[in-house]
Design a protein with these regions (language model features):
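Enriched for short, Lys/Arg-rich terminal
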Residues: 1-9, 13, 17, 21-24, ...
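A short, surface-exposed loop/turn module that caps and links secondary-structure elements
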Residues: 31-57
């Protein structure tokens, strides 16, 4: 059984606001995560105020996720440009 990717409402809106080619690139990246044994193998754990979240870099975009091991779920909570996503 593989991992499941879900987007929060906020992340869905943010993805819809991104140019189509970049949004497609992000969606393809997320679909690759579903196939991995551990989604942590490609991401980076965040610290300080964002501890508990994982970051994935897709070009100039950052995808911030919460990983729930018990449910095999990667919940995308924020998608944004690298210059503003951490604000």
């Amino acid at each position: 059984m593989g991992w499941r990717i879900e987007l929060s409402r906020r992340a869905e809106k943010q993805l819809a606001a991104i140019d189509a080619p970049e949004a497609l690139r992000i969606v393809r990246y997320l679909s690759e995560l579903e196939k991995l044994e551990s989604p942590r193998s490609r991401g980076k754990g965040l610290t300080a105020d964002l501890s508990g979240l994982w970051r994935y870099s897709v070009g100039d975009w950052r995808v911030l996720c919460r990983i729930e091991d018990g449910r095999l779920l990667v919940l995308v909570v924020e998608i944004g440009h690298r210059s503003t996503v951490y604000n």
